[in-house]
């Protein structure tokens, strides 16, 4: 859970310190679009290219190496002096984080007792938005007492403990050859489309894409968009942190509800979040309405992403779990890259805040429709055991 918290913290740290970096380096707001996105490219590389190695080798070793990379490159971020150096550290740290999260979800799902798998995966993934909330608080504290460099020094030193903790306590999970994968052979992305899994795999990818696009787009740009709309900086940062807190609270509820009632819960959550996003664009810079709507959006969309992971971890056989979760998260991270980059283009071209939030709302509606597709699959397979949703 602690490492998942750090994933959320690092994902938000650059957003919270970006105004300070922009002032220090005399950068325009639009310059942060590529910087936000390059770290997410690293998340994609880690999730789809490296995390699946856990299904073929040793998940514990892969996790330790990923955690080591995270610690080294986070600490190095504190000492960058140019935007290109910052982007490079974001890319390398993102590769480590993208590798680590699918491995942790897979190990947690395998280690949890039957009947409690959804609970344990929920607790793990819920740590992500809580880490983002804690990151906002730490960034505010660090910037009041020092510089943006200090924020990355503190987080890098914290991350240095993870490889040691993993070496001592992390369970590797069962080897792939012990899980009895029916089709035999090596596990590849094409395995995710066999045995009638193709439609569910596509729906999972769309749900992850839409959910993570909104989560990272809002997480990265919310402070700057609110400041752009006339809100004081300290209020904008506080609201952005509460967005992540809403994700934590909603994640617990939606993760457990999705485990029990299925993807219909996610469909409703994303639709409700879409309505609230339109509301944020409509109320402008009024602090309390924006705060309450932002917390609600956080509960519905980043919170819904917890349910995505709970469902994904139970959708595939154990032998291909890291591959399935990794590709779902990896394709979702494409949304992470696309969202911040598109907002950067929109801001540079003068699009209004209501227009940007309307686009975000449309993406949430797409995620809701994909969740309906997952729910239809589940309804059409009444004989599937409750502890694993499979299409074979």
Where are these regions (language model features)?
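Extracytoplasmic
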Residues: 1-29, 218-223
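Extracytoplasmic gate region of multi-pass secondary transporters
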Residues: 14-15, 197-251
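Helix-breaking motifs and short loop linkers at transmembrane-helix boundaries and internal kinks
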Residues: 26, 58, 79-85, 283-285
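Conserved MFS/SLC helix-loop-helix module at the cytosolic interface between two early adjacent transmembrane helices
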Residues: 45-81
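Cytoplasmic helix-loop-helix junction between adjacent transmembrane helices
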Residues: 89-126
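Helix-loop-helix hairpin linking two adjacent transmembrane segments in secondary transporters
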Residues: 114, 123-170
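C-terminal membrane-cytosol helix-exit motif in multi-pass small-molecule transporters
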Residues: 158-178, 367-375
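C-terminal transmembrane helical hairpin of 12-TM major facilitator-type secondary transporters
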Residues: 258-311
């Amino acid at each position: 859970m602690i490492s998942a918290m750090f994933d959320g913290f690092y994902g938000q740290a650059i957003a919270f310190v970006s105004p300070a970096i922009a002032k220090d380096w005399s950068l325009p707001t639009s310059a942060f679009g590529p910087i936000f996105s390059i770290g997410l490219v690293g998340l994609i590389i880690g999730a789809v290219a490296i995390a699946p190695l856990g299904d073929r080798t040793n998940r514990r070793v892969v996790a330790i190496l990923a955690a080591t990379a995270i610690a080294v490159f986070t600490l190095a971020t504190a000492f960058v002096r140019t935007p290109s150096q910052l982007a490079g550290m974001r890319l390398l740290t993102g590769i480590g984080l993208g590798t680590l999260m699918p491995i942790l979800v897979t190990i947690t799902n395998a280690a949890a007792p039957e009947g409690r798998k959804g609970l344990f995966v929920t607790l793990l993934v819920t740590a992500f938005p809580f880490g983002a909330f804690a990151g906002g608080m730490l960034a505010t504290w660090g910037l009041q007492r020092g510089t943006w460099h200090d924020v990355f020094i503190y987080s890098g030193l914290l991350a240095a403990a993870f490889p040691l903790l993993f070496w001592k306590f992390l369970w590797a999970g069962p080897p792939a050859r012990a899980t009895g994968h029916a089709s035999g052979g090596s596990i590849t992305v094409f395995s995710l489309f066999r045995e009638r899994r193709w439609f569910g795999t596509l729906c999972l990818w769309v749900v992850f894409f839409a959910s993570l696009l909104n989560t990272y787009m809002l997480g990265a740009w919310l402070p700057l968009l609110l400041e752009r709309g006339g809100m004081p900086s300290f209020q904008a940062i506080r609201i952005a942190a509460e967005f992540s807190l809403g994700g934590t609270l909603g994640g617990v509820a939606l993760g457990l509800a999705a485990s029990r009632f299925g993807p219909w819960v996610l469909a409703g959550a994303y639709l409700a979040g879409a309505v609230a996003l339109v509301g944020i664009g409509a109320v402008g810079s009024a602090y309390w309405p924006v705060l309450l709507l932002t917390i609600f959006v956080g509960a519905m969309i980043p919170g819904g992403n917890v349910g995505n992971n709970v469902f994904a971890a139970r959708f595939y056989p154990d032998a291909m779990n890291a591959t399935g979760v990794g590709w779902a998260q990896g394709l979702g991270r494409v949304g992470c890259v696309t969202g911040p980059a598109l907002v950067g283009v929109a801001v540079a071209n003068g699009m209004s805040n209501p227009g940007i939030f309307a686009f975000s709302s449309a993406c949430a509606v797409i995620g809701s429709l994909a969740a309906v597709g997952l729910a239809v699959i589940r309804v059409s397979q009444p004989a599937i055991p409750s502890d694993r949703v499979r299409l074979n």
